[in-house]
């Protein structure tokens, strides 16, 4: 629990640091643009992992005898580990300034909040009791639903 909290704090600070990357073509660095072009390639990793996690949590509610907790933990950690470079590359790609400002801004904030919630889901998941439902379990499930919803909207605006 303590390790996941420390990691969540570090990743949250990293996310806040990304907000200082200038957008709208203020950075003129070909290497930055090159790296940013990998955003559309790797973004499918956290998307797939979060959606599969969401489905596995639903299955786990209806069939606790399957005991999918370990698999859910692995998927959630994989989501966090893959969402961080996805967000970084997205900010680098956005810095090229070749995008509709309104769509880019909406996509940026939806993606940023998706990453932030994903990071803190790890803490909630480790704190919740797998044996009996409690308030942390309800918060975890509610935030997972919110996260998947944000993910769907972020993907919609990013693909536009």
Identify what each model region corresponds to.
Residues 1-160:
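Polytopic transmembrane helical bundles with strong interfacial aromatic enrichment
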């Amino acid at each position: 629990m303590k390790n996941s909290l420390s990691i969540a704090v570090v990743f949250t600070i990293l996310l806040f640091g990304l907000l200082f990357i200038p957008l709208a073509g203020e950075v003129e660095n070909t290497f930055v643009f090159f790296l940013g072009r990998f955003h559309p390639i790797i973004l499918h990793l956290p998307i797939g992992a979060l959606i599969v996690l969401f489905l596995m949590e639903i299955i786990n509610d209806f069939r606790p005898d399957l005991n999918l907790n370990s698999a859910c933990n692995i998927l959630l950690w994989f989501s966090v580990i893959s969402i961080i470079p996805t967000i970084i590359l997205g900010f680098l790609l956005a810095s090229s300034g070749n995008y509709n400002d309104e769509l880019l801004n909406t996509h940026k904030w939806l993606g940023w909040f998706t990453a932030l919630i994903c990071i803190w889901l790890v803490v909630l998941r480790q704190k919740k009791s797998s044996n009996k439902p409690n308030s942390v379990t309800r918060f975890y499930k509610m935030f997972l639903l919110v996260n998947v919803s944000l993910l769907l909207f972020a993907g919609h605006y990013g693909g536009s």
